From Swiss-Prot:
It comes from the Bacteria. CGA has typical kinetic properties for a glucoamylase, but this bacterial enzyme had higher isomaltose-hydrolyzing activity than other eukaryotic glucoamylases. High activity towards 1,6-glycosidic bonds. Belongs to the glycosyl hydrolase 15 family. This is Glucoamylase. Its EC number is 3.2.1.3. It is a lipid-anchor. It catalyses: Hydrolysis of terminal (1->4)-linked alpha-D-glucose residues successively from non-reducing ends of the chains with release of beta-D-glucose. It comes from Clostridium sp. (strain G0005).
């Protein structure tokens, strides 16, 4: 497509590469900017994020390439740069037409299959076959280990007719710096390579192809973007080269030139950085780029414990997902998930999703690293937590990777978890900066918590009290190692006192379920037998506190605070199983609690603040850990978690009752993957590997 050039800018790039010494450096780039036809009728309609049902997630296993990608519905979904909490892309997908009679969107109109390059890498092959049997698109997706570039090699095949019967288009939806609105798009030619650029503030993206574009257009979402144009006209009729608003960048692939091609999306903090990365990545040998990406991940996996050869693909995939969830600037900041729950119904007002740091989730991730033998990663997470302790001695409910609070609830288990982790890692050097401030805060605020671990309601929670007792016991030991004997005595006395109060504060003997005796989810008053109503979040309703049960009470056993054969534990197990357990075709799982509203109302409705909570696979793992503590076999629960994983080896936050398949909740949920990683060797060794032994010895083995 011929275009008039109205701006010519020769650009000299002084830096030779992101990594010194890499090949195919570009020292001088000539940039011509097109600025002929701006899109009209902006700024475009409001957009959403992508589905949270991820088929894969990935990044280079190093601190140099700061790009993370996700896959959903057979296409690239959210991509993050330069930090793991900053999404810049909603989606990159293909659209197929015959130019006259049909339009086929690969994310809606194909059957998508995902394969890993190897069991020990986070590189993916997607095979999308048209539901009507007309075409197939095969894609390989990974990142450049030396640059801030996402690479996709694609192949289009005609299953009906010939390639010349089809037109292939690419749609790129930028959501730069967690915002879909008011992004700027424009077109340049750099060293004779046409690139679709997008920018917001100091973040730039450059989309390019090794065979160029047959045509392109930048339009406003649902006004005149490429998808709207194709729906109306079956081929590209709009040819805009700039727009500012809620934009979609579109391009036509010249199938006559080649049906197999490479697409590169590069990032930078300036236009020249993004353009340079794109040119350098395209100039590299594709197979070499792919091999380098695979080699980094395989080297990591081969460094992990393999448990005498028993380690399986889900174990390795879980460890890679956890490893990939660390920010590369703020080291040790492991987010909860590379997803936005129910993202296809969430807009710009949901900037955080689950790509934030929770102290609780990070604790479980660190325990997985310890179990797998990656103690360095666990230590980095603890060092990070020490940096986010606030002046009042507490860690926020969750934070951006910078440590800036996102939500502001106070959860005392999130204060205790880093103390337990410090004990497990023997990090007595963090006493003044982490352990003591958190322990003092727990004593000041507890045992009543502002929110329990489901982040919804305050009161006296058996799970939170288990964490408080375990945390203070560990804090007492660490205080002794630092010769702070006065604090050590204070912490241990408080732990002993609260351990004795757990039953009085959280165990009802007059409940309406089963025989009436069990640990309740949470007591709003310091009397679990009181007639006191609590409000269930997310539209769950209002109920007497004695009506609600939760598997979280098993933390009493997991953390060594109660014996697994304590009659009160056994009583509650029976009540929980009869009330909130479901046997799915893939294995058993549990609701967080009865009347939970955090989930889709139905399979045809997204969650928008009220619904029905579904089953949580991580609770299956927690039950397995209890069975091990009780001297039993956890294999059925381990297998259930394996069955809950999707084709890409990803475990979601929630699954459907009738199928055991993922809902549109967060996926992957790192907490669930961490649970699987710890359960796997615990079942082999017949021992709860993340139980703090000092707590167990004091309260159970005495």
């Amino acid at each position: 497509m011929s275009r008039k050039l109205i701006k010519y800018l020769p650009l000299l790039v002084l830096a030779s590469s992101v990594l010194s010494g890499c090949s195919n450096n570009v020292s001088s780039i000539k940039i011509d900017r097109f600025n002929n036809i701006s899109a009209v009728n902006g700024p475009g309609e409001e957009d959403t994020w992508a589905s949270a049902q991820k088929q894969g997630v990935g990044t280079a296993n190093n601190y140099v390439s700061k790009v993370w990608f996700t896959l959903a519905n057979g296409a690239i979904s959210e991509v993050y740069y330069p930090t793991i909490d900053t999404a810049d892309v909603k989606e990159i997908k293909f659209i197929v037409t015959d130019g006259k009679s049909f339009v086929s969107d690969e994310t809606k109109d194909t059957i998508s299959k995902v394969e890993k390059f190897t069991d020990k890498s986070l590189g993916y092959k997607l095979v999308n076959t048209d539901k009507k049997g007309r075409y197939r698109i095969t894609k390989e997706i990974f990142t450049d280990v030396k640059r801030n570039s996402l690479i996709m090699k694609a192949k289009f095949e005609a299953l009906e007719g010939s390639i010349h019967d089809y037109k292939l288009y690419l749609a790129y939806d930028p959501h730069i710096k967690n915002q879909g609105s008011y992004n700027e798009g424009y077109v340049i030619k750099a060293n004779n390579n046409e690139m679709l650029m997008a920018k917001r503030d100091n973040v730039y993206t450059a989309l390019s192809s090794n065979i160029g574009w047959k045509g392109y257009s930048i339009g406003y979402y649902k006004v005149n973007d490429i998808m709207t144009d194709l729906d109306e006209n079956k081929q590209m009729t709009k040819h805009y080269d700039s727009a500012r608003g809620n934009i979609i960048e579109g391009a036509e692939i010249d199938l006559k030139k080649n049906s197999q091609f490479e697409i590169v999306l590069s990032f930078g903090n300036s236009e020249d950085e993004a353009v340079k990365a794109s040119i350098e990545t395209l100039s590299e040998n594709y197979d070499s780029l792919k091999s380098a990406y695979i080699d980094e991940w395989e080297k990591y996996c081969n460094s992990l414990n393999n448990f005498n050869g028993k380690a399986n693909s889900l174990y390795y995939n879980s460890m890679m997902i956890l490893k990939a969830s660390e920010d590369k600037t703020n080291k040790g900041a492991y987010i909860a998930s590379l997803s936005i729950p129910w993202g296809d119904g969430q807009g710009d007002d949901n900037t955080g999703g689950y790509h934030l740091v929770w102290s609780r989730d990070l604790y479980h991730v660190a325990n997985a690293f310890i179990a797998a033998g990656d103690v360095d990663s666990a230590n980095r997470s603890l060092d990070y937590l020490a940096k986010v302790v606030k002046d009042n001695g507490m860690i926020p409910q969750n934070t951006w990777i910078s440590g800036k609070p996102y939500w502001t609830g106070i959860q005392l288990d999130e204060q205790a978890d880093p103390i337990i982790l410090s004990y497990r890692l023997r990090r007595y050097d963090l006493y003044d900066s982490l352990v003591k401030p958190l322990a003092d805060f727990i004593i000041k605020m507890g045992p009543k918590t502002g929110q329990e671990r489901w982040e919804e309601i305050g009161g006296y929670s058996p799970a939170t009290m288990a964490a408080e007792v375990a945390g203070l016991t560990c804090a007492a030991y660490i205080a002794e190692q630092n010769k702070d004997y006065e604090s050590a005595q204070k912490y241990q006395e408080k732990a002993d006192n609260w351990q004795k109060l757990i039953d009085n504060l959280t165990y009802t003997e007059h409940g309406p379920l089963e025989n009436g005796q069990y640990y309740i989810r949470i007591a709003g008053l310091p009397d679990p037998n009181a007639d006191f109503t609590i409000s269930i979040a997310n539209g769950g309703g209002v109920y007497d506190q004695k009506e609600i049960v939760d598997p979280s009470f098993l933390e009493l056993v997991r953390l060594g605070v109660k014996s697994p054969d304590d009659p009160k534990i056994l009583n509650t197990l029976r009540v929980v199983d009869s009330t909130i357990k479901v046997d799915t075709p893939k294995g058993p799982s549990w609701y967080r609690y009865n009347h939970d509203g955090y989930g889709e109302p139905s399979k045809t409705e997204l969650y928008h603040g009220a619904g029905k909570g579904r089953l949580w696979p991580l609770l299956t793992g927690e039950r397995g850990m209890y069975e091990i503590a009780a001297g039993k076999d956890a294999t059925p629960y381990l297998k259930a978690m394996e069955n809950f994983a999707n084709e890409g080896g990803i475990i979601s936050e929630q699954v459907w009752e009738d199928t055991g398949l993922p809902t549109d909740s967060a996926s992957p949920l790192n907490w669930a993957h961490a649970e699987y990683v710890v359960l796997f060797p615990s079942n082999i060794e017949h021992k709860v590997l993340d139980m703090p032994d000092i707590v167990y010895k004091r309260y159970v083995a005495k």
